[in-house]
Amino acid sequence: LRPIPQEILAHEAFTGFENPGRVNPGLVYGTISRQEVLPDILSGYEKRSFGEQVDGRIENIVDVVSGVLSMGGLKCNGEFQMIRGVAIYPQDYFCCFNFETQGFETTENTVSIHHYFASWTPLGRRIHFKLVKAAAAFLGKERYLALKRKIKGERAV
């Protein structure tokens, strides 16, 4: 959408949350060479056999990087943090995707958009995502979320 601002590029390394609990370097990961976190991320790859299930899904790079940063003190709250020289930006900077409605919500902070096609997921899951997106677009975000909560028996936030 726009060039990465100089104040972001000035960090040794930077990336962003895809949601409050997970840092996704697939959105963006900029770094200087030999930044102190990189060996730990690479080591995380060497120790894993990808394809394993984690929380009902296939483990991926998000799990590796979030784990390394968590060991460095990352708080999974979606707020800006500096962990071992890595600036982690809130979701609206590099991932303005709303997973609940399958739509985009840009802000004045938004630098880029990652299109989640979820091509690695089973066909049934991809169809589910498309149905959610269509329902949210048809009903409107607020009505869709209210209906979803009512069906699940959740209280309104």
Model-derived segments and their meaning:
Residues R2-V157:
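Glycosyltransferase-associated regions of secretory-pathway enzymes
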